[in-house]
Swiss-Prot record:
It comes from Shigella sonnei (strain Ss046). GO terms for biological process: cellular response to starvation. The keyword Transferase does not apply. Belongs to the IraM/RssC family. It is found in: Cytoplasm. HAMAP family: Anti_adapt_IraM. NCBIfam families: PRK09919.1 (NF007393). Keywords: Cytoplasm, Stress response. Inhibits RpoS proteolysis by regulating RssB activity, thereby increasing the stability of the sigma stress factor RpoS during magnesium starvation. GO terms for cellular component: cytoplasm. The lineage of its organism: Bacteria, Pseudomonadati, Pseudomonadota, Gammaproteobacteria, Enterobacterales. This is Anti-adapter protein IraM. Its main location: cytoplasm. It comes from the Bacteria.
């Protein structure tokens, strides 16, 4: 089954991400990975990760839950990445970020 990413929230200090996805129903996945799943990405879950653009990537999925608007709003409001000031300077202001390649193109 293919899943489509609707939106993603990243917590850069711990490397955890949350994505709102659409498959057979709308869901929220909580995961850790070295890749970023931007909105519009289409992937297939497999035993040890996901297949994205015909390539398999390891991913640790901690939980999958039915989409809940209130929970998603809470996750979005606590989003640390990207901070608003960074859009002006093109520099990440998070000294504790553990993500090696910024999905937002910040340095």
């Amino acid at each position: 089954m293919k899943w489509v990413v609707i939106d993603t929230v990243i917590q850069p200090t711990c490397g955890i991400s949350f994505s709102a996805i659409w498959g057979d129903m709308k869901k929220i996945i909580w995961y850790q990975s070295t890749i970023f799943l931007p909105p519009g990405s289409i992937f297939t879950p497999v035993k040890l990760g996901i297949i994205l653009k015909e390539k398999e990537y390891p991913i640790t999925i901690y939980n999958i839950a039915p989409f809940n608007k209130n929970l998603w709003s809470l996750l979005k409001s606590s989003q640390e990445c990207p901070p608003g000031e960074s859009k002006i300077t093109n520099k990440c202001l998070h000294n504790s970020c553990i993500i090696k390649i910024c999905p937002y193109g910040l340095k």
